[in-house]
Amino acid sequence: MSTNEGSLWGGRFADGPADALAALSKSTHFDWVLAPYDVVASKAHARVLFRAGLLTEEQRDGLLAGLDSLGSDVADGSFGPLVSDEDVHGALERGLIDRVGADLGGRLRAGRSRNDQVATLFRLWLRDAIRRVADGVLEVVAALATQAAAHPTAIMPGKTHLQSAQPVLLAHHLLAHAHPLLRDVDRLADFDKRAAVSPYGSGALAGSSLGLDPDAIAEELGFAAAADNSIDATASRDFAAEAAFVFSMIGVDLSRLAEDIILWSTTEFGYVTLHDAWSTGSSIMPQKKNPDIAELARGKSGRLIGNLAGLLATLKAQPLAYNRDLQEDKEPVFDSVAQLELLLPAMAGLVGTLRFDVDRMAELAPLGYTLATDVAEWLVRRGVPFRVAHEAAGAAVRAAEARGIGLEDLADAELTGIHPQLTADVREVLTTEGSVNSRDARGGTAPTQVARQLSAVRDTSERFRVRLRR
């Protein structure tokens, strides 16, 4: 049987909890990451207690000095949780009492509950975490942009259904991976508006009767506002679920980039060679160069999705207000951040060191009759209805396929035999360069458009960097 010594809640109980309950309740193995935030919030709380007349100036200063000492010891690792500590809050109260005594140290708990305390600390931690994750995502975007800038005219096969479809610029394709990642960063930045609401002062659920000032502590801790409803503030974790969704979306977007790299690095595609420092070998096959980073990105995306699903399942159908189920809210989010902090630098390094075989891509770009759409649209520009033009282009493909040649190899007579307006002039679009250059509308794959896209990606990235530094 455990004792209640050092517990934040033992007065009502004659005995301590059963050992199995104590083990089940323990959370210091994961919530210790909140310790620095707990110290900062406790200092703000001491100042609020002083302004409310609940501490003398001497008591306030003594608590602040003790918290400064405790914070330094937490930072350098000389103070940590004991086996007997239930959670980060109890461990830090123990540390504070060791430094300032039980009478003074015990005064800090006035006006706050672990319910509002942990909800506040979780938000503080998460607001910092999303900035670190966003920085990592922007590094991947920067690597994609650098590769796009290095290959402004390289042409590759564009695909739908993994089948050759139309020629596109490699830079266009790379930037197509950058845009969803930038939207993820936008989601993180937008999420911060909802995370920047402080639950502090809500108490267990009903608020405080001690004359505390939630707005003052919210401002001191860098929040935009204090919560409007104390029950909602202590019981809701939609902010955690929203963050977990964005983290999982980042994982999904990285997994699509990863899948492209995996395919491109195969012998069958042959688009890229992986740098030695960003790939691995085989313990039995000497020739292998494996895309482990990309494969781990695919795998970790599943883990991130699982963290989101698990968190949503935990939150489902909980009655108001706080329930102990919410002890399970942090580990999925902590894990998602930890996985992304491992993955994002590796993905940036992988992308930044890819060596593209532009000749191979250019050779494959027209194969599979990828210029057929250009034939149809060439006819449309000459007044032929698209339905008819589509049929004519399809007939040209069928004729070339029957002879085992490309569209460009059909004789002039064969072309006009398919459709009278399909003259020799169509050959101006029967090159991959002509095809790419013709797609000069906004968002298209023409070099002028892709250059604009690259500039926009870089400008947007920089705006996000500035915004996230605030």
Swiss-Prot record:
Presence of keyword Hydrolase: no
GO molecular function: argininosuccinate lyase activity
Entry keyword set: Amino-acid biosynthesis, Arginine biosynthesis, Cytoplasm, Lyase
GO cellular component entries: cytosol
EC number per UniProt: 4.3.2.1
UniProt xrefs under Pfam families: ASL_C2, Lyase_1
Domain of life: Bacteria
Localization annotation: Cytoplasm
Catalytic activity: 2-(N(omega)-L-arginino)succinate = fumarate + L-arginine
Pathway terms, separated by semicolons: Amino-acid biosynthesis; L-arginine biosynthesis; L-arginine from L-ornithine and carbamoyl phosphate: step 3/3
Xref: SUPFAM superfamilies: L-aspartase-like
Top EC class for this record: lyase
GO BP annotations listed: arginine biosynthetic process via ornithine; L-arginine biosynthetic process
Gene3D superfamilies xref list: Fumarase/aspartase (C-terminal domain) (1.10.40.30), Fumarase/aspartase (Central domain) (1.20.200.10), Fumarase/aspartase (N-terminal domain) (1.10.275.10)
Major location category of this protein: cytoplasm
Family membership noted in the UniProt record: Belongs to the lyase 1 family. Argininosuccinate lyase subfamily.
Protein known as: Argininosuccinate lyase
Gene that specifies this protein: argH
